[in-house]
């Protein structure tokens, strides 16, 4: 039944977006009673956490494949950035649910749920940090605090992706993707 609930929530997420998800709509979509859903999940945020983990797992698998390629470490970071950009466009609903957790100004999850969310995203930061660490060992990069750089790199990518919404206003006559690529190049250059 847990899978049935997540299938219904995923269907709603992909067909109507994050705002459309409610326990009553999940109940209707899954053909399960509201009480049954509450038996498995305390609230819709717990369902969001499960969907967020799916999205992060998918994104992680893409980034992991890039991290294992036998290419220059700077090129790995470029490809990771491009993969995240592509993910934000092609897996928009998963990106939206990941963003739901990152952009909320308040933490409204119980500590255990918050920890689950944070740990699922931490895996990606560890991959980036490992690439930078390896690049330092090979003399490609020069960075003293690889953890901070990895957080800055990922946070910058995430923020830049959100600037796509400004394409018709602030970024008028600018290609968002070119601005994104330019920024990634500058970030990587900063540690060479």
Language-model segment annotations:
Residues 90-111, 162-166:
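Amphipathic alpha-helical segments used for helix-helix packing
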Residues 2, 23, 45, 49, ...:
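Short, structured helix-loop boundary elements
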């Amino acid at each position: 039944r847990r899978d049935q609930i997540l299938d219904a929530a995923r269907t709603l997420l992909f067909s109507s977006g994050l705002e459309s998800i409610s326990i009553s709509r999940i109940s209707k979509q899954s053909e399960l009673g509201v009480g049954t859903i509450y038996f498995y999940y305390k609230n819709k945020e717990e369902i969001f956490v499960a969907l967020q983990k799916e999205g992060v797992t998918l994104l992680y698998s893409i980034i992991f494949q890039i991290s294992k390629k036998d290419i220059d470490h700077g090129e790995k970071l470029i490809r990771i950035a491009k993969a995240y950009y592509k993910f934000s466009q092609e897996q928009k609903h998963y990106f939206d649910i990941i963003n739901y957790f990152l952009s909320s100004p308040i933490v409204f999850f119980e500590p255990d749920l918050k920890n689950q969310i944070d740990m699922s995203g931490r895996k990606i930061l560890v991959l980036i940090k490992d690439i930078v660490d390896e690049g330092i060992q090979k003399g490609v990069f020069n960075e003293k605090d690889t953890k901070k750089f990895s957080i800055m790199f990922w946070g910058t990518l995430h923020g830049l992706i959100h600037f796509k919404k400004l394409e018709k206003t602030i970024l008028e006559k600018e290609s968002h993707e070119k601005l994104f690529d330019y920024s990634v190049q500058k970030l990587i250059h900063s540690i060479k």
